[in-house]
Amino acid sequence: MPSPLAPMAVFVDLDERSYTVHFDSLATVPSLLEDVGLAAGRCLLVTDENVARHYKTPLIEGLSNAGWTVRSLVLPPGEQTKSASCLHRIYDDALAWGIDRQTPVLALGGGVVGDLAGFAAATLLRGLPLVQLPTSLLAQVDASVGGKTAINHDTGKNLIGAFYQPELVCADPQTLDTLPMREYTSGMAEVIKHALIRAPDLFEALEDHLVPVMARKDREIVSSVIEDAVGVKADVVSADEREEGRRAILNFGHTFAHALERVAGYGAFTHGEAVAIGMRAGLYLSHQRHPEAVPRERLDHVIRAVPIESDPAEVPFPDLYAAMAADKKNEGGTIRFVLLEQLGQAYVTGDVTEADARHAWQFACSN
């Protein structure tokens, strides 16, 4: 939904917790903080080593020039950082520095940093102002929007977390220029997901421009599909903030994906790669139930545009299924899947047998 506040922005309508996703330079962050009523003072900047090399220094300089005193914490990159130990590093550093409830937490990085720093903000002093500064495509179109924050547990992914909305999101399109191609194409998996579950027009745009979009060669088209994808996420979240109903459709592909990430070991697949594989499995199940309404070959062609570097077939299905049984979305011991009724319409079901899931996994792993 277009924001009433800016031409290149998306508004997330959550009553008193509403905020805007700005598609603008990180140089605008000091003024954006002022716009939402965050007066210059102390702020805690959380980022990772990869992102820090490119964006930490200029961001701190801009904040300092605007009167902010910045404490920065640079963490290792990768999914392993979404852990209790790294969370406590943030706690220890923040409390030793002497934060108060007016100290904003700035999450500069991809989905891992956003989830981790967001959960720290949600729990430190029972809540600090949170500002999401996503630098990866996956974070810009998905992880930074909607208020989900979490860390992983040995039992599964994102099992310890909270819903906690940011004060604002600033997604700088230029940060995608320094993103490794694998991370970029992985992020496109979430764009494709948003198109499949809610936006046939976005899916058609991806179909029509699949090669330049996946190759990151047309900035105008890429910017357009990103903004449309964020609009899908914002609309769904605005209608169901805490995933009590409709928001669950955003988990299309994620039941398989989260299990795959856990069983294969975090880092073997990027989150986007796992989601792409999970969407192929979900597409198989959807077509099985709605063969006329869900054109499997057409939709699969776009999903397959996401390159997969590791072989999911090496993950034994019994291990995968056991991991799915521990998924946080399950209810009453039933594994819940998001399926497509048709392009642009999705629903949640627990009516998937183990045999059906096995066949879907075999399809997802096929060439």
UniProtKB/Swiss-Prot annotation:
- Write the record's keywords in alphabetical order, separated by commas: Amino-acid biosynthesis, Aromatic amino acid biosynthesis, Cobalt, Cytoplasm, Lyase, Metal-binding, NAD, Nucleotide-binding, Zinc
Provide the binding site for Zn(2+): 190, 254, 271
Paste the cofactor note.
Binds 1 divalent metal cation per subunit. Can use either Co(2+) or Zn(2+).
What top-tier enzyme class does this entry carry? lyase
The UniProt record lists the keyword Zinc = yes
GO cellular component terms, A-Z:
cytoplasm
Q: Where in the cell is it found?
A: Cytoplasm
Q: In which pathway does it act?
A: Metabolic intermediate biosynthesis; chorismate biosynthesis; chorismate from D-erythrose 4-phosphate and phosphoenolpyruvate: step 2/7
Q: What cofactor does its activity depend on?
A: Co(2+); Zn(2+); NAD(+)
Q: Which InterPro entries match?
A: Dehydroquinate_synthase, DHQ_synth_AroB, DHQ_synth_fam, DHQS/DOIS_N, DHQS_C
User: Mainly resides where?
Assistant: cytoplasm
**What GO molecular function terms would the record report?**
3-dehydroquinate synthase activity; metal ion binding; nucleotide binding
Q: What is its EC number?
A: 4.2.3.4
Q: Which GO terms describe its biological process?
A: amino acid biosynthetic process; aromatic amino acid family biosynthetic process; chorismate biosynthetic process
User: What family is this?
Assistant: Belongs to the sugar phosphate cyclases superfamily. Dehydroquinate synthase family.
What exactly does this protein do? Answer: Catalyzes the conversion of 3-deoxy-D-arabino-heptulosonate 7-phosphate (DAHP) to dehydroquinate (DHQ).
UniProt protein name: 3-dehydroquinate synthase
* Annotated organism of origin: Salinibacter ruber (strain DSM 13855 / M31)
| Gene name of the record | aroB
